[in-house]
Amino acid sequence: MKILLFICGEGLGHTSRCLALGKEFLAAGHEVSFGAYGYSRELVRKTGYSAWEIQPEIRLIGETGIFDIGKSIKETLRNLSPVGFRKLLKLIEVLEPDVVLSDGYYSGILAARSRKVPVYFIGHQFNMEEFFQKKGPLLAVAGKLVRRFYNYIFSSVDGIMVPDYPLPYSVNRRNFTIPRALNPNIFFSGPLIRSRYREVEAKAFRHPNVLSTIGAFGYRAAIFRKVLEAAKLDPDIHYTFIAGPGIVPEQFPEIPENVEFTGFTDNPFPYYRGSDLVITAGGHGTIMESLAFGLPVLSFPDEKHTEQENNATVLEDAGYGKRMSYLTRPEVILACIREVLEDENYRRKTRRLMELAEVLDGPAAVRKLLEEKFGERSAGKENSKEET
């Protein structure tokens, strides 16, 4: 079976789960191609795979922790071009995939449909109209147009893969609004994680160890500064900071002795395995990785980023962690860290999610689904080529 994976480059979560799928398909003897751009393409190549360059699509803009939908729309429209779309069509013609998997990359879906190739949408956010609400009449109209577009996308694909725990455990459940008629096409795969818990050797840290990740946005440096201040208040709690592509360690002077600043890593899983708690933004990918490794989460969602705020709310409501704020003071951050570390109920619930992730084995579940649907089709294509 020949699989083409298109990757949205906004946030590393899309890339990480596509790498998990690519690893699974390749191990099973299938042929995999990646289409990506920006630092997502760089990460694919650092992992050891080749990646075709595709045009950028969605671009998220924000300052000081506040998501700006207006600027994001302008940047997204600036990225799109007919030339880039024609390159997608040509890429599909050259690679001749049996199926296209498009993770948050809508142009890839349109190109696959145009070439009559089966295509699946991978995503966790299904209520984008919320981003446009209460922001004036023009953005309200834009939101309705966006809703019509993504409803068309959801109804035109061969299936929708949700890289989350099935209900009632799903973290994205507040972002999940799809017409009931599409239910037969929806598949909750479980977390798509590159490394399974039992396969990872833990980093050797002093405990308790708090792992802080910043993702891909430089403006989230505010989280680091607040957490650094919290770290100074209790030297008995140890911290490991993993920076994103937009952050350099030199931005943070006077790092206390109980803090290790590692810079960016393309393999965070030993850090998860060796830690007791994760501090992150509200991105779905990092939250899934944390929960799949049994870790409670303190989530700092970007303000006005509805999807992230919903994720963080579910974390708190379900007892998997706490929803934080960029306004939270260091003293309160420390109080929340202590509460989550000391209250066994948090760890008990997230440990259950770790066990569930192992049972679900998201990448294998997706592979088996596609093998059942397209395995025979792929074999038929090869036989046809040999006969000609």
Curated annotation (Swiss-Prot):
Its EC number is 2.4.-.-. It comes from the Archaea. Gene3D superfamilies: Glycogen Phosphorylase B. Keywords: Glycosyltransferase, Transferase. SUPFAM superfamilies: UDP-Glycosyltransferase/glycogen phosphorylase. It is an enzyme of class 2 (transferase). One of its GO terms (molecular function) is glycosyltransferase activity. PANTHER family: GLYCOSYLTRANSFERASE (PTHR21015:SF22), UDP-N-ACETYLGLUCOSAMINE--N-ACETYLMURAMYL-(PENTAPEPTIDE) PYROPHOSPHORYL-UNDECAPRENOL N-ACETYLGLUCOSAMINE TRANSFERASE 1 (PTHR21015). Belongs to the glycosyltransferase 28 family. This is Uncharacterized glycosyltransferase MA_0453. It comes from Methanosarcina acetivorans (strain ATCC 35395 / DSM 2834 / JCM 12185 / C2A).
